[in-house]
Amino acid sequence: MTFFRQETKFSCGPASIRNSLIALGFLYSERKIRELSHSDRLSGTSEKKIWRALKQLGFGYKTFQNRTEAAFKQRVVYNLKKGNKLILLTDHEDHWISVVEYGNKYLTVIDPEQKRVRKQLTPRSFGK
């Protein structure tokens, strides 16, 4: 499965949507997702913009926040085991990534800003 880097400096949100949908077997261009989410150079992509794009593409979403890092990691693994794909806000709420799989005790993390977008991390090392 091929995942993609973000096409602009401000489009990590649409790129993360794109990569999550690829993991589900759907292919959309980042440009289309940028248009649907109204991402822009000044403010990037807010949570509401992510939700808007997913809804317009016909996909559901759930939001969650956790009080502890341990609860967060547990929820990530739980959702991946159920077959869900995650789009997560990181770096002090400034950068979107996707987490698309859990297997053999590793998370498959897709960071569209990195040259090698796919990383395998243990839940313990995730978030550090």
Stretches found by the model and what they are:
Residues M1-S43:
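Active-site nucleophile-adjacent alpha helix/oxyanion-hole segment immediately C-terminal to the catalytic cysteine
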Residues I22, K32-K128:
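Conserved active-site-adjacent core of cysteine acyl-enzyme catalytic domains
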